[in-house]
Structures are given as structure tokens and as C-alpha cells.
Amino acid sequence: MKNKKFKRVLVILGGTSGERAVSLNSGKACIKALKKKKYSVSTLDPKFKNINLIDKRKIDVIFNALHGKDGEDGVAQSYFEYLKIPYTHSGVISSYNAMNKLVSKDLFIKNKILTPNFFSAHRAEKKINNIKKILIKKKMYFPLVIKPVNQGSSLGVKIAKNFKDFKKITLHLFKNYEQLMFENHIGGQEIQAAVINNRAIGAIELIPKRTFYDYKAKYSKAANTQHIMPARLDRKNYKKVLSISSKAHKVLGCKGVTRADFKFFKNKFYLLEINTQPGMTNLSLVPEIAN
């Protein structure tokens, strides 16, 4: 947002996804920062005002502060493209690639970026016993991470410690999500890195008090997640995680800012996912890394 010809900024925030609260907080933080820089700022919340009512004659650029479904999966971006209005963050295809964990993992593997072993199942075509057979065939083990294919902010992410957990969690999640991904749980350090305009700017380490870095650990002060900046890595590995982050950003075709989520275990970095609409709240990691 350094281009001063973009003086009139429309911040789109809120929306109707499960990440609405985070989006509102991110949007408010961005509005405050933009006003401080003397931009003319207007707002739109798709929950209360149809996004089709955007009047492109009154704005120069859209700051997309939406999170989750329709906001960071290429849907909103495709409408911005239709209106021919410049907007922040990644484009249609890269947003879809990053939001769909199966697509992004496939791209990671094709580009030799290490990611945890996984497979997916659709509720309409798989039974629990069939999924169990696939687990055995693919030599996957417990604990196992089970997550929706296209959700952000760790919504719906669960960890199964045994087959009893696995069955209970899978049946529960299939009530709300059509497709799930099953992924080997990787121990070790939780590392996240920020990339801005293709350049990785830093990496932070997280020590959650909860079982893992879930939604509450990310956005609740009460969760008491410890942030260590910079991450406790030697010089070689610190440079390596930044390099992988930048590579993944480019592989997915991203632009602007992204956040890469890793586990560092036995001297290897496992890339979990790329977030194209990272949070901008006072608890969010990208602002902390940037500062």
C-alpha cells in the first residue's frame, strides 16, 4: 500500500465464514493503520451489505481483510477481477491453490518441498473401515491430524491419538465438512515465517500451552501461547526456512503477503500450509515478525 495514487481504499472485512471474528479484528487494525497514513478509508462487511454494491467509481483499491470461505479461496478475488479494481493479497488461482490443502500439498510435492504424508476422503464415498485400510496401506500412524480440506485458522482441526479417536473425530467432522484430509502428526518446533512480495522477512517460533496451535491458541490471549522472535534455529536452518517459505510463495503463485506454517523435526522442515490472508490482529504473527 505504498502507491500514493491509491488514495481511496475500501477495506472489506467480516463476512460470513467461521473466521468472521478474526477478519473483523484484522480489518479494524488495517483501517487504523491506513488512516494513520492519511488514506481515505471506507468499509464494507459482506454480512450486511452485498459485495455487488461496490461502486468502483468511489475507490482506487480494495484492501481484502476477509478470512476463510469466499474471502481467501478465490471467490472474492474473482469478483474484484470482474470489477477490474486493484486489490491486495493473492489472486484468484493462487488463493484457491493455497486454501485447498490437497492442491497446495500436491504442488509442494511436485516442487520437492517436504510436507507430512497424507491422504483425503470424501464423506459420500468412504466408510471408516475403508479409511482404516488406507491408513495401513500408506503406513500412516497415530497421532494423526484430521482437518477439513478447505478451512483456515485451524478450524475443524483435530488430533486422533488412536483408532477410537479417529473414528469419533472423522464421523463428527463429516457432519460439517464434505472432504477431510488425514495427515501424519509431526512433532518438534512450531515455526512460522512471513513473506512479503516474494521475500521472506523472518521466522517466529510458537510454544502453545494447548495440545497444538489451534484456533484458540492463535486468537485468544487466555491461551498463553509463547512467541519467540526470532525462532530458535541456527543460522543455517533459519536461512533455510526463509528460503523454503519464499519458494512455496512462488510455487503457489502468491503475491503480497503470506505466512508459511512449518514443523521442524529431526533437522527437517515440514511445510504444513501457506496462508494467503494472514491475520493482522494484535495477536497475529505477520505484524509481529515485520516489527
For the regions a protein language model found, what residue spans apply to each?
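A short, polar/charged loop-to-alpha-helix boundary motif
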Residues: T211-Y213, A217, T281-I289
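Conserved metal-phosphate-binding beta-hairpin within the catalytic cores
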Residues: N184, A193-V195, H249-N282, A290
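Short, intrinsically disordered, charge-balanced linker/junction segments flanking boundaries
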Residues: P116, E288-N291
